[in-house]
């Protein structure tokens, strides 16, 4: 099986542990999927786009897309995971070396969640 096929099978297996009832309850209570996020972090799915030298998997957008696709297919809402996976790209592209060292390993380990960021532009 290819690496991407293995990723797909792994995320399907993980998503099957969180039935529709889990997602419906979160929607009803307007809750955040903390338990699901913890498992995704522990399994390394939220750090697929972070380079290996910062503790991530160093995979590409196709792997990230597969993960989000299978979360959606299983009945989950990928919004919270999309933010975690993609907004750290701002640190990779525009962050100082110190910021990369401070934040990316912690994101990779699931100790830090980066859900949003602000942008300012000169007037």
Regions found by a protein language model. Give the residues of each.
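Glycine-rich flavin
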Residues: 20-123
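Flavin-dependent oxidoreductase catalytic core characteristic
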Residues: 1-17, 53
């Amino acid at each position: 099986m290819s690496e991407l096929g293995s990723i797909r099978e792994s995320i399907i297996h993980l998503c099957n542990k969180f039935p529709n009832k889990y997602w419906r309850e979160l929607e009803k209570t307007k809750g955040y999927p903390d338990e699901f996020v913890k498992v995704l972090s522990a399994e390394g799915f939220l750090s697929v786009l972070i380079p290996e030298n910062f503790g991530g998997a160093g995979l590409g957008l196709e792997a990230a897309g597969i993960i989000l696709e299978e979360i959606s297919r299983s009945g989950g809402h990928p919004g919270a995971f999309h933010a975690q996976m993609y907004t750290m790209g701002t640190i990779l592209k525009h962050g100082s070396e110190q910021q990369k060292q401070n934040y990316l390993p912690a994101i990779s380990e699931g100790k830090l969640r980066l859900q949003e960021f602000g942008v300012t532009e000169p007037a």
